[in-house]
Amino acid sequence: MEIKVIKEEQNYLELQIDGEEHTIGNLLKGMLLKVPGVKFAAYSLPHPLITSITIKILTDGSISAREALIKAIELAENYANLFIDEVKKI
């Protein structure tokens, strides 16, 4: 996995993630939309034969786009840990 910043402003971040496809794209988009202050989050897979996605994040300015991404990743980690705990109970 390699992450490249395509464009960054205070409330906007566009990243290219090489070596990843829909799995991480859907996860990040879903978690980003749960972060307060995020107005828009989306990802695209430019071509099905290329394993690279582009993620776009736009916030209302109350949080930076980079901070929103970090919070979304932390949220995903919390969900994963909760899921692990529930599976262990089975």
Swiss-Prot record:
Localisation: Cytoplasm
Reaction it catalyzes: RNA(n) + a ribonucleoside 5'-triphosphate = RNA(n+1) + diphosphate
Enzyme class, UniProt record, top EC level: transferase
SUPFAM superfamilies linked: RBP11-like subunits of RNA polymerase (SSF55257)
Molecular functions per Gene Ontology: DNA binding; DNA-directed RNA polymerase activity; protein dimerization activity
PROSITE patterns linked: RNA_POL_L_13KD (PS01154)
GO cellular component assignments: cytoplasm; DNA-directed RNA polymerase complex
Any Pfam family matching the protein: RNA_pol_L_2
Organism superkingdom: Archaea
Matches recorded under InterPro entries: RBP11-like, RBP11-like_dimer, RNA_pol_Rpb11_13-16kDa_CS, Rpo11-like
Enzyme Commission number(s) of this protein: 2.7.7.6
Keyword Hydrolase in annotation: no
PANTHER family according to UniProt: DNA-DIRECTED RNA POLYMERASE I,II,III, DNA-DIRECTED RNA POLYMERASES I AND III SUBUNIT RPAC2
The protein's assembly and partners: Part of the 13-subunit RNA polymerase complex.
NCBIfam families: PRK01146.1-1 (NF002233)
Its biological purpose: DNA-dependent RNA polymerase (RNAP) catalyzes the transcription of DNA into RNA using the four ribonucleoside triphosphates as substrates.
Name this protein carries in UniProt: DNA-directed RNA polymerase subunit Rpo11
Naturally occurring in which organism (per UniProt): Sulfolobus acidocaldarius (strain ATCC 33909 / DSM 639 / JCM 8929 / NBRC 15157 / NCIMB 11770)
